[in-house]
Every structure is written in C-alpha cells, then in structure tokens.
C-alpha cells in the first residue's frame, strides 16, 4: 500500500475536498498547494502523478489527528522521517479515536478477522519480542472497513426494499 493510496482512501472515507485536504496539512503547521494535493491524488499511471514521501504522509496523518480530535496545546509532534504500516495504523487509530474492539469490528466489516493479541502486536515497539509487522493486507482491509463504516455505498442500505405494486393497489 503506497502513501498515495492511503491518502486517496482517507480522502474518500471522510469525503474531503481539496480545500479540506489543504486544511488538514495546515493543522500540522505545513502549507501545501492545491496543485501538490492534486498531484498526490492522481492515479499512479498519470504523467502528473507525484509520489507522497513518508514525511509528507506523517505530516498529513498528524494533521488528520488534529483535524478530527482537536489540536493540542504546545509544540506539534514532529513527523516521522520514515513510515511503516504499523505507524500508519497507529495514527489512524488515534485520529478516528478507536479502541481495539472497534478496530477488530472495522476489520470484521471487511470479513477479515484478527485476535486482540495479534492486533496489540502491531502497536508494540519494534524491539518488543511480541512485535509484529503490519502487512499490506491488514492495512488495506482496515481502510476498506473504515470506508464501509464511514462512507457506505447508497445501495448498501440494509433492509431497504421498494414497495411492490401490490402494496400500492391496496
């Protein structure tokens, strides 16, 4: 999963327009242009596509935390110079204010099951003996689950049915 993929999915999940995306970066005290945002959101095969580096992605995630949870007083956290799926998952957990049970439920929406122990291994320090690297499949399923939770398709409305012609005649 590339940083650009994560950025595109978060934009879709939260239904953010370009101005809102610029605002999220501004929440982390970084100014970006509409053109930069547009280039990051383009498809990988587009000639104007520009790759989002780890520091820029970390800045966006810090801004997302500030945007969704409110900015804390004092100095802002420094963006990490290199990211991995574990850090991205942790920052999304913080931004969406999710507990372990809620993360497991989001993964379950996508039909992906993990135990609490497997999940907690993703949030441990890399030196810890029970640390586990978060694979692309887990992050992809988590983002897909968030999409189902926060941005359901219109045709996913459970229990909806059109009234039959018989009902109208009565």
In which residue ranges do the predicted regions lie?
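Short N-terminal segments
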Residues: 1-2, 33-35, 165
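Leu/Val/Ala/Ile-rich N-terminal alpha-helices, chiefly Sec-type signal peptides and the beginnings
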Residues: 3-6, 11-13
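Short, flexible segments with low predicted structural confidence
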Residues: 8-9, 31, 60, 74-76
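A structural feature that tracks compact, well-ordered secondary-structure segments
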Residues: 10, 16-28, 35, 40, ...
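Acidic (E/D-rich), amphipathic helical modules within compact regulatory domains
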Residues: 20-70
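Solvent-exposed, non-transmembrane amphipathic alpha-helical segments
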Residues: 27-31, 41, 45, 57, ...
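Intrinsic, low-complexity N-terminal interaction/targeting segments
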Residues: 48, 52-55, 59, 72-86, ...
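Short, solvent-exposed interaction modules
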Residues: 62-113, 150-152, 156, 163-170
